[in-house]
């Protein structure tokens, strides 16, 4: 997954990580995780896997110097 793909996924979920601090992004991720977690809604298993992959890519971009 590319960084652009990760941004696109979160934008579709109404989260705009490119305009957030890392702390704000983490809070937004946890809100999504509570909403789409497979234990809460089994039909969202694949979506949650994509959210987790996108989160990993975006967090790596926060760690890299610009």
Predicted regions and their residues:
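N-terminal J-domain/J-like co-chaperone modules of DnaJ/Hsp40 proteins
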Residues: 1-43, 50-65
């Amino acid at each position: 997954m590319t960084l652009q793909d990760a941004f696109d996924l979160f934008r579709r979920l109404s989260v705009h990580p490119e305009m957030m601090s890392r702390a704000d992004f983490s809070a937004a991720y946890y809100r999504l995780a509570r909403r789409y977690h497979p234990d809460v809604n089994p039909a969202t298993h694949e979506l949650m896997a994509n959210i987790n992959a996108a989160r990993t890519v975006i967090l790596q971009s926060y760690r890299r110097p610009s």
